[in-house]
Amino acid sequence: MITLTPGHLTLPQLRRIARESVQLQLDPASFAKIDAGAKAVADIAAKGEPAYGINTGFGRLASTHIPHDQLELLQKNLVLSHAVGVGEPMARSSVRLLMALKLSSLGRGHSGIRREVMDALITLFNADVLPLIPVKGSVGASGDLAPLAHMSAVLLGVGEVFIRGERASALDGLRVAGLAPLTLQAKEGLALLNGTQASTALALDNMFAIEDLYRTALVAGALSVDAAAGSVKPFDARIHELRGHRGQIDAAASYRELLEGSPINQSHRDCDKVQDPYSLRCQPQVMGACLDQMRHAADVLLVEANAVSDNPLIFPDTGEVLSGGNFHAEPVAFAADNLALAAAEIGALAERRIALLIDATLSGLPPFLVRDGGVNSGFMIAHVTAAALASENKTLAHPASVDSLPTSANQEDHVSMATFAARKLADIADNTKHILAIELLAAAQGVDLRAPHHTSPKLAPVMETIRSKVAHYELDHYFAPDIAVIAQLVGERAFAKIAPFSFASEQ
């Protein structure tokens, strides 16, 4: 059980919500603020004075006054008309994050929503009745309207859900959770729809995957150093301290620890090779830069996870209703775009190491990592797959945040495209996962070919894990299943756990 304290969510909590089947409860200390916000909205609605989002239309229709007897219909119509998403359902892990983030935002008491509505969301979450949310349809301002409308429609008994993974109607989902359809009061539909929770949830979910890939890449890169008989001297702490970048210093420390005590490394200490290619030698510089970007993105996304991104905002102490633009997800878009650059570079560097290993001139290993070359092609086309994926990532890493299209009759004339920025991270991460799987296979093959010398004590479990699933490559065979099984292990964090490094979300 995780207790949500609105405004005080942590990255480890968010990772657990995404990756584990934890249940949620709201911190009782938030109840007074929630109730005060709901009362403030009820008082404003009762007075009948125009207040945006409470008794007016929305967007370009904000100047249209809505009579008191139509306020409930206004909120219902808002939810139903905005549920226009298309595409595949959002991943379960992202939906769980989305719901938790929405609860945190509402729980700060500036949205004017009743606890009854929040309790219904928590009940659905804990019953594993998750809204089916199409992943496409948001431009990241005014908030993630379409995705959040699909979440909210379930509370009305409209739309679809997944009941413990099985697709069903919203009404069936409510019944399983012991709930009845809600009637939303003034502003409650808008409070549910307005916010950056979809883009932030997608960005966080994919960030956690990219963090795991980063750690896996440290391990794969270190194993490639041994496979290529590379030097550990470029990882000397003194080099990196002189430059001063925190990420670079930390990455170099990881490589030193992973390669410490390697008999392969000891076997060529006195060779006449002066410098390794950049894909080996400059790993701390490249991976360190990626790490710095990822840490910054985590900081931004944690702030956003704890933010109130509704509009308008209710200030119960003064009774004021202030319209602003906290729904504009530009910070999320920038963070996601930076994560895309980091994830693409992780894959790009790994692809270069694969290319090095299969090149006999550079690695000193048999061409394409197979002894009987010619009749056997070895890793030749596995590298081509890695190159294809790395190239695809370069296009996917193009920043989404530099694009904008005006919507709502030019009332909403600049948007963030944060949801797309966050969503495409999943494709980049999947490509990078498979590149790393190919590198791990190639590096393991290279280490085998260094016999009788073997790799370091820290990397020995990596070899054992790989060889428990895929045998040493002796002859050409149907190769795709080998890549698939190692990619699955990468996704299960089998190699990430070996890296002597952890992110804030794992603390």
UniProtKB/Swiss-Prot annotation:
It is found in: Cytoplasm. The modification 2,3-didehydroalanine (Ser) is found at S142. The gene is hutH. The lineage of its organism: Bacteria, Pseudomonadati, Pseudomonadota, Betaproteobacteria, Burkholderiales. The keyword Lyase applies. GO terms for molecular function: histidine ammonia-lyase activity. Pfam families: Lyase_aromatic. InterPro entries: Aromatic_Lyase, Fumarase/histidase_N, HutH, L-Aspartase-like, Phe/His_NH3-lyase_AS. GO terms for cellular component: cytoplasm. Pathway: Amino-acid degradation; L-histidine degradation into L-glutamate; N-formimidoyl-L-glutamate from L-histidine: step 1/3. The keyword Cytoplasm applies. There is a cross-link at A141-G143 (5-imidazolinone (Ala-Gly)). One of its GO terms (biological process) is L-histidine catabolic process to glutamate and formate. It catalyses: L-histidine = trans-urocanate + NH4(+). SUPFAM superfamilies: L-aspartase-like (SSF48557). Its EC number is 4.3.1.3. It comes from Burkholderia vietnamiensis (strain G4 / LMG 22486) (Burkholderia cepacia (strain R1808)). It comes from the Bacteria. Belongs to the PAL/histidase family. Keywords: Cytoplasm, Histidine metabolism, Lyase. PROSITE patterns: PAL_HISTIDASE. This is Histidine ammonia-lyase. NCBIfam families: hutH (TIGR01225), PRK09367.1 (NF006871). Contains an active site 4-methylidene-imidazol-5-one (MIO), which is formed autocatalytically by cyclization and dehydration of residues Ala-Ser-Gly.
